[in-house]
Design a protein with these regions (language model features):
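Hydrophobic alpha-helical segments and their helix-loop junctions in multi-pass secondary transporters
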Residues: 138-156, 167-168, 180, 199-227, ...
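Membrane-interface "cap" regions at the ends of multi-pass membrane proteins
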Residues: 10-66, 268
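Helix-loop-helix module between adjacent transmembrane segments
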Residues: 10-11, 15, 56, 90-106, ...
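Extracellular loop-to-transmembrane helix junctions
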Residues: 1-19, 72-102, 111, 330, ...
Length: 501
């Protein structure tokens, strides 16, 4: 329990100390923000700071810090370290700069921002990458809740149309269309802060239930400083990829521009962007602690948690909430596993619309222009979602790549932020160091993971994975990270030389 409290204290201190260093490095000033200057009543709308924070939290969080943290807890309390230091030095930095760089560029989507600092080739790659990723996220966050609602209906004794996934999927997609089309303040700005509060209350209830029940003990890092994963999956870099949103997530960079278009002052960035990420880190830390405390540890392995997760991640959330909060917890869990994914799904589609609008230079003041983008974006999402519901499209393989693409996107954004800071003659190491680290994480995972290149280098017997070839993957990851840093340094020298010429 001491380990948990120390990490919690570090996160809070990190917000006030390192978060302020990050804020001062960027240098917010009194210039007019896009929300004040443009104010189109649709996407550029001034919102109060407390709303900005809660909407940003819900947009970037959803169930990410819960699912990722529970999965990360399979490695044991060592995951506390990554959640804590990853949030302070990588995730918070990433979210802050993705939001503030967007704000300095008229609220542009992350693909456009990246292109301005890394060049047109990377810009086009990011445009395609972002739209595909956002539509995929939005679709999966429609299919998942639809299936959960069906389960709840069946468990309540209902039958007929209400117990079909297709029916609920269509309902959710209709809602997505409306939320993507209308003003951000109409639904997202009014209702989402409530769900953001629910997400926080659920986390507080979980940790309170653990502290007040003598049967639960959060294991200490120093007593369990080992790989406790039941399958022996390597900590590096699988744990760093798996935790995702609980420490750093590239998906956040697609969401931050939404709030960058709604800020009244640049000085709100520290609280809205860095603060929301720290809050998400705290939520992830709590759920990781629950995963470590509530389930049986057998022979130094997290066997009990693995068994709970085998029944499904949603089932694991129900179990944690029921054990720590009783009936109230079950009600909160129902909100969590159904509402939170939907709130991430609709903002994903909204971000896809805005990314396409920036790309194709289609002004979004006119409802006709918004309709031109909403119909194809939601149309693709509907095709994929309905295809999944009818069984002729399978997301299982595609979704395996999400965590990797998520962290790779974060890596690219951090390199873009590094170039931005260099051009502004500011301390670019504050972003270049985590960018280098995430380069190693992404490359190592891509080489080692079975769904990527792992099948080529790992050892298999009778079709089953026997051993990971870390002797090959680890050096490749390190070499790639060093190469990326070298390319960045070369680019800075080239830029300096061109300026002198």
């Amino acid at each position: 329990m001491i380990s948990f409290l120390l990490c919690l204290a570090l996160l809070i201190i990190g917000y006030f100390v390192y978060g302020k260093i990050v804020d001062n490095t960027f240098g917010p000033d009194d210039r007019e923000t896009p929300a004040v200057r443009i104010n189109d009543g649709v996407d550029y709308v001034v919102m109060p700071q407390w709303k900005l924070f809660l909407v940003q939290l819900l947009n970037i969080a959803g169930l990410g810090p819960i699912f990722g943290a529970l999965q990360g807890a399979l490695w044991g309390p060592v995951v506390f370290l990554w959640i804590t230091f990853g949030t302070i030095f990588a995730g918070g930095v990433h979210d802050y700069f993705s939001g503030m760089m967007s704000e300095r560029n008229d609220g542009a989507s992350i693909a456009e921002v990246t292109g301005r600092y890394l060049g047109p080739v990377m810009q086009n790659i990011m445009r395609v990458f972002s739209v595909v990723l956002l539509i995929m996220v939005g679709t999966v966050f429609a299919v998942g809740p639809a299936g959960l609602i069906v389960t709840l209906c069946k468990n309540s004794g209902m039958s007929g149309l209400l117990t079909t996934t297709l029916f609920w999927l269509i309902i959710i997609l209709i809602y997505y269309f409306i939320a993507t089309f209308i003003s951000i303040d109409a639904i997202i700005g009014k209702i989402y802060p409530v769900f953001g509060i629910c997400l926080i209350i659920m986390a507080v209830g979980v940790i309170f239930g653990i502290f007040t029940n003598p049967a639960y003990t959060i294991p200490e890092i120093w007593a369990n400083f080992s790989n406790m994963h039941p399958s022996g999956t390597p900590i590096w870099s699988f744990m760093f990829i798996t935790v995702a949103c609980g420490a750093i997530s590239g998906f956040h960079s697609t969401q931050s521009p939404l709030m960058a278009r709604c800020m009244k002052s640049e000085k709100q960035g520290h609280f809205v962007f860095y603060g929301a990420m720290v809050c998400e880190g705290v939520i992830a830390l709590i759920w990781a602690a629950a995963g470590c405390a509530l389930y049986t540890i057998t022979d130094g392995k997290m066997a009990g948690l693995a068994e709970a997760l085998a029944a499904g991640q949603s089932a694991a959330i129900y179990d944690v909430c029921a054990k720590t909060m009783g009936g109230v917890g079950i009600a909160l869990a129902m909100i969590g596993v159904v509402i939170c994914p939907i709130t991430s799904g609709d903002t994903a589609f909204r971000s896809a619309r805005l990314t396409l609008a920036d790309w194709l230079k289609i002004d979004q003041d006119s409802w006709v222009n918004r309709l031109k983008l909403c119909i194809p974006v939601l149309g693709v999402g509907a095709f994929l979602g309905i295809g999944n519901a009818l069984g002729f499209i399978n997301y299982t393989v595609i979704w395996r790549y999400f965590s990797w693409t998520n962290q790779t996107l974060a890596m690219i954004v951090l390199w873009a932020a590094s170039m931005y800071l260099f051009k502004e003659k500011k301390n670019y190491w504050i972003t270049a160091v985590p960018a280098t680290f995430m380069s190693a994480v992404s490359c190592t995972y891509f080489v080692l993971a079975p769904e990527c290149l792992g099948k080529m280098i790992n050892t298999y017997a009778d079709g089953k994975l026997v051993a990971y070839n870390t002797a090959v993957a680890y050096p490749i990851g390190i070499i790639f990270a060093i190469a990326m840093l070298a390319i960045f340094i070369h680019a800075t020298k080239k830029h300096t030389a061109s300026q002198k010429a």
